Amino acid sequence: MLLSILYIIGITAEGMTGALAAGREKMDIFGVIIIASVTAIGGGSVRDVLLGHYPLGWVKHPEYFLMVASAAVITVYVAPFINHFMRYFRTIFLVLDAMGLVVYSIIGAQIAMDMGHSLTIVCIAGCITGAFGGVLRDMLCNRIPLVFQKELYASIALFATLTYYALSTLQVEHTLAVLLTLINSFTLRLLAIHFEWGLPVFNYQELTSEEQDKQPNKKK
């Protein structure tokens, strides 16, 4: 019950952030709904396809898609009127996104565990569910996914997955396991945002032909 409530809050918030991303790319209402849906439920769909878990979550519960689509349409008409206050809403969205990330990861991990998969697959399922909606959104908006650019996001999904898996393995009561995972991972995500923690970045620039010609010849 707790996960279901948090999941609904999460997909609504993700749908709204997806709609805003589509608006920045000047998409029509159809594009807005598609980007919002991909952001909110795309990660779970990718997970289900890879694991052979059918029917897909939003096919089994079409009301989830309707919630996301409704949130997207509402965002289209409300966003222009609250543009001056968007910096305050951005903070709210960051908090809700952090919560959604953890909730998605827990759900992905639980589905993989219910299917009897190993820890490796459980971790992959949790990370895909938590982070790949944003990856698909950025790809469709022709941007390098934010998940791949230093920020601790997929790493938090992995941390949440491992935490939940460990607690479940120790046979901690389900609701308590969810709450402990949510509190720990949610707090870590907010700290990462505040202190701008990130993973090391690989910055490789290949020399042009002119730059290579300027390099001193190395004697053998």
UniProtKB/Swiss-Prot annotation:
Pfam family, one: Gly_transporter
Domain of life: Bacteria
Membrane topology: Multi-pass membrane protein
Record localization: Cell membrane
InterPro entries: Gly_transporter (IPR005115)
Predominant cellular place of this UniProt entry's protein: membrane
S-adenosyl-L-methionine keyword on record: no
Keywords tagged on the record: Cell membrane, Membrane, Transmembrane, Transmembrane helix
GO cellular component: plasma membrane
Bilayer-crossing regions: 26-46, 65-85, 92-112, 116-136, 152-172, 175-195
Family affiliation: Belongs to the UPF0126 family.
Name assigned to this protein: UPF0126 membrane protein HI_1240
Organism: Haemophilus influenzae (strain ATCC 51907 / DSM 11121 / KW20 / Rd)
